[in-house]
Amino acid sequence: MRITPPFGYEEVVPFLKTQKVCLLAAREVPGFAQRSNAIPISHTEFQLVAREYPIVFTGGDGKTFAPVAVLGLTAGENLFFAGGAWAPGVYVPAYARRYPFCMAKVTLDKAQQKDRLICIEKAFVDEQRGEAMFDAKGQPGAKWVEIERLLSEYEGDLERSREMCSIVADYGLLEPFTMQATLAKEKGGAAMHVTGMHRVSEKKLEDLNAAQLKNLLRKGVMARIYMHLLSLENFARLLERKAARPAAS
């Protein structure tokens, strides 16, 4: 059996009821997110994410896309990571809140299984310092009930995200773009170019036929398109966060 770790995870193993786990503190930032300038988001998160973060679409093959929240303006930079935790008053994406757990793809006998498996980052399994998620009778504790609900709801929401991205891509609505900005001279005057992003083209959106527009509305995609477009204004807020940091950072 081979388990494919999701983005940001190093080595994941199947989660067992008997394992003891080291959980992250509230608003603690997973190691991978401290060093990432983007993080995946899901369908129902758009409204909350759009308040603080730019939402863009990324796709390595140019055909399959996924929505992400932009966290920084340079590689390895999370401008919402401050004082060892997520910045106060800012929504924490579910992708970070579920860590160190995940739902991972499993390959068995060279065939990828349809169902995903609840897994955990191996480094967070600790029989000495960890805490049990189930009692001696195998009954789930309150924390595990909450974690399992998050995992289940998030996984279901990802399916809606994949459907949304498939529709947007099939309609040819996405176009690549680059965010360019320059810091003030007193902050070093560095020029920044954020690439690898796609956004919905308003011109292409206007060219859709009535049936396509109706489908976007029926599927709840149109609302998310507008949230995405409005969220792009948050690049200016990212630049403000960048400028507010000491020049040495």
PLM regions: where:
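Short, extreme N-terminal leader segments that mark the start of a protein/domain
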Residues: 1-71
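Short, basic/low-complexity N-terminal boundary segments at the transition from targeting/disordered tails
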Residues: 31-34, 74-79, 157-163
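Short linear motifs in intrinsically disordered
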Residues: 43-48, 92-94, 107, 169-170
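A short, compositionally biased
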Residues: 49-52, 97-98, 173-178
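Short, well-structured alpha-helical interface segments that form or flank functional binding sites
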Residues: 50, 91-94, 159, 200
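Aromatic- and glycine-enriched beta-alpha-beta binding-site module
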Residues: 58, 66-136
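A contiguous, surface-oriented mixed alpha/beta subdomain in the mid-to-C-terminal portion of proteins
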Residues: 103-249
